[in-house]
């Protein structure tokens, strides 16, 4: 890692969504910090982020022209996000106001139709497209046709029953050099029973709340790598170039991590390698991400789940020094939950359905005691509050 090019002092976004504030403060948020995001103004520069979802409202002003359409996978569908889910995730990754990595470039990969449904084969094709596109960009950079390219990250805020095919596709994309974040799922269950949450080479992300608790719906277990803000998240939306919406889910947590991966990748020195222009591999950056995360900050985390959340020091010199000296691993002591739901111990077979659908938890003024049990279908990992 290297120090910041322009200044060691972070920029401060006032009036930021609470999720951005949380990832830039080690301690719990206070009245004075709950809406302040500390960041590098160059964060994400030179990095492509593939948002594999329902598409992206690429004309939204918050993207400042940094969002483009990659590919529409479903046959006969339009190059447009008619749902909003993908646009919301993209905004959290790279929006000027709502995003973690404010200079990253979003590439929309539409794998689900506007109603949120689609085939598992289309999702796999979307992952394969992202990997192939990344490899093409690496070759362009090595030939001097794309200067400043640092590499690629990806976000996948969808999932369903265990699918070896999808897990293999995601792991292969990571092997190709993409730094991948995936949602853990919203079933309040063991994330190892779902895909792509079980893809071991990706970063699997659970959802946390403003009160530093595991979100009541968030999956948990040994396949979880980290938690990130996922309840009542404000970001970009469809319908106009300025539309916004507040929604919840591990869908919202995962793009915080995808954005942070892009952010950290952009701080790497440019150097050709088998993975990307930045030499660091996805495996090493994942280890670095975990090494600078906060351990033991969350309540209601089952004892078999890593109590790790993506909060970092606002002092960027400290962060970069930690990454330089990181051994690449992190030891996490199990935390006894204050009042967490029991960890599932009974094995249950789930068929990997070929249909993906949106998972919408009922809008509510207060949190229910437990989420609605979902059928064996693939789904987007969000709920909508309008």
Where do the language-model regions lie?
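Autoinhibitory propeptides
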Residues: 1-20
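Substrate-binding/access-modulating region of protease and related hydrolase catalytic domains
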Residues: 43-44, 96, 111-201, 211-216, ...
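Structural recognition of the beta-strand scaffold that forms the well-ordered cores
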Residues: 48-52, 105-110, 152-157, 179-183, ...
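Catalytic-core environment of secreted peptidases
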Residues: 52, 57-63, 67-70, 80, ...
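Hydrolase catalytic cores
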Residues: 90-93, 105-113, 128, 216, ...
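Cationic, amphipathic, low-complexity alpha-helical segments enriched
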Residues: 312, 319-323, 329-386
């Amino acid at each position: 890692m290297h120090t910041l090019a322009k200044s060691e002092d972070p920029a401060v976004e006032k009036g930021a969504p609470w999720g951005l504030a949380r990832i830039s403060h080690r301690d719990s948020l206070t009245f004075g910090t709950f809406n302040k995001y500390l960041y590098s103004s160059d964060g994400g520069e030179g990095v492509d982020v593939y948002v594999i979802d329902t598409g992206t409202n690429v004309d939204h002003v918050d993207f400042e022209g940094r969002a483009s359409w990659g590919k529409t996978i479903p046959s006969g569908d339009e190059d447009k996000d008619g749902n909003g889910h993908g646009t919301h995730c993209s905004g959290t990754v790279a929006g000027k106001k709502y995003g973690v990595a404010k200079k990253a470039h979003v590439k929309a990969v539409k794998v689900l139709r506007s109603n949120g449904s689609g085939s598992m084969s289309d999702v796999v094709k979307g992952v394969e497209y992202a990997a192939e596109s990344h490899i093409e960009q690496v070759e362009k950079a090595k030939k001097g046709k794309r200067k400043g390219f640092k590499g690629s990250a990806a976000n996948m805020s969808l999932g369903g029953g265990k699918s070896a095919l999808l897990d293999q596709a995601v792991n292969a994309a990571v092997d190709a050099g993409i730094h991948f974040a995936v949602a853990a799922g919203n079933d309040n269950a063991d994330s190892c029973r779902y895909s792509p949450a079980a893809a071991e080479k990706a970063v699997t992300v659970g959802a946390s709340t403003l009160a530093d608790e595991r979100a009541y719906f968030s999956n948990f277990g040994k396949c979880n790598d980290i938690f990130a803000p996922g309840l009542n998240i404000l970001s970009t939306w469809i319908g106009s170039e300025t539309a916004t919406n507040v929604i919840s889910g591990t869908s919202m947590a995962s793009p915080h991590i995808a954005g942070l991966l892009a952010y950290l990748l952009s701080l790497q020195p440019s150097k050709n390698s088998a993975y990307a222009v930045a030499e660091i591999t996805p495996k090493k950056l994942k280890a670095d991400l975990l090494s600078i995360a906060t351990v033991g900050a969350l309540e209601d985390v089952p004892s078999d789940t890593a109590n790790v959340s993506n909060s970092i020091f606002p002092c960027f010199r400290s962060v970069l020094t930690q990454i330089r000296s990181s051994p690449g691993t992190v030891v996490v002591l199990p935390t006894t939950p204050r009042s967490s739901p029991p960890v599932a111990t009974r094995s249950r077979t789930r068929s990997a359905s070929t249909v993906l659908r949106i998972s919408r938890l009922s809008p509510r003024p207060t949190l229910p005691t437990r989420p609605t049990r979902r059928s064996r279908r693939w789904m987007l990992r969000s709920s909508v509050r309008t």
